[in-house]
Amino acid sequence: MPKFFRLRYSLRECAGDLAGGLIAALIALPYGLALASMMGLPPVLGLVTSIATAPITALLGRNPVLIGGTASATVPFIAKAVHSQGIGGAAKVCMAASVFMMVFCVLRLGRHIQKVPQTVVTGFSCGIGAMMFLSQLGVMLGVKAHVDRTSNNMLYQSWQILSHVSQAQMSALIISAVVIAAAFLSAHFFPKAPAPLVGVAASVTIAVIFGLHQREVGKLPLEIPQFAGFAWHPADVWNVIPEAFGLAFVSSVNILITSRVVEHFRGRHRHLKRADADAELGAFGIANLFAGMLAAPMSAGIPARSLASVRSGGTTRMSNLFHAGFIFAFVALGASCISHIPIPALAGVTAYIGICLLEWSTWRRLPKMRRVDALAFLSTAIAVLVVNAILAVAVGCSFYVARYCYERLSNPVASEDGMGKMAVGAR
């Protein structure tokens, strides 16, 4: 078990973790509710996922600042289960997927994520950043255009929004722009200040002073549901195994890649140990088993929350616990001050984190990179936007596999270290 309680926990660390947990909880509110609705589940279950799983992943997980929650990558699997088997059936699929994740941990499959080249990880980070920014275009512009959410092509969805740019509302654009500008200024002049929170506070102040009215978070008169009731039958095992395995695989890759992105974003060049990746899957497997008992969807790594927490000063496991505590308070107590935050302000926070993820240093080095590294970086970033994150990683890795096969066929002696280079990639 990782060291959870430390002899020294300074007030500065506590303040940073509180700020990081708060901004992560604010980001979780609209997206948790929306994703659960897309799955066909009661919206509150999207928040229950974070409340139920965060304490377990904070205690057992190896990445102290990795924050999980309801993820878009799990939507197709759970939505299909809800449609065919109901909420109880979806709970069975999630619980079976949790068992698969624990099996992956026991088989030590998580450590193989270290074989993904660093250029693929940076391309994944860049693609996720662009996706985070583009996904907020409609909210930041105040455009209420119909967008085909069934398509994974984020570029196509963005084009649908921009084709209705004439309907843009200046108030929404100003609120989101103030968040982004204030966050960047705060990060530049006051590096230790929680930049996303500064941006939200600035946007709320501007909205009140100038009377900029936009849709707000609103009150959350929601109740925590009881444990899900369902019965297992022998035939159910064969019905849930295919979907559960797919859900477990997608969630596992998401968690491990997100963990590497977060470590890279923190500026830590020393990778986590190989065993840490296995333990991370075990921690999320145990946590998701408990979430499944509540009929809540699976928890996976969320880059937006994790990186927003880091940007706000979160450095320890307590930021994850505070994130869950704030969500529980919002749901159970209905914090009135949170209800008045404009939705475009939260969209601005997500867009700000997305801009930070765009790997500007890698873009500057791109002309000097090896051809295979440049192709892997660009293809991964683009594939995240037009296909999905999991296939994007496969596309990026395929260039190194092709290079290894070519070297093995053309020069068998020189190919001895080919696979080693695949695991390192470009620095």
Regions found by a protein language model. Name each.
Residues 74, 289, 401:
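Short phosphate-engaging motifs
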Residues 39-48, 62-74, 113-121, 192-198, ...:
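Short, non-helical or kinked segments that cap or interrupt transmembrane helices
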Residues 6-23, 27-64, 234-318:
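Membrane-embedded helical hairpins/re-entrant loop segments and their flanking transmembrane helices
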Residues 1-21, 78-79, 83-272, 325, ...:
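Core transmembrane helix bundle of multi-pass membrane transport proteins
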Residues 31, 48-57, 71-83, 323-327:
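Hydrophobic alpha-helical segments within and immediately flanking transmembrane helices
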Residues 32, 68, 419-422:
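Generic signature of intrinsically disordered, low-complexity, basic-rich segments
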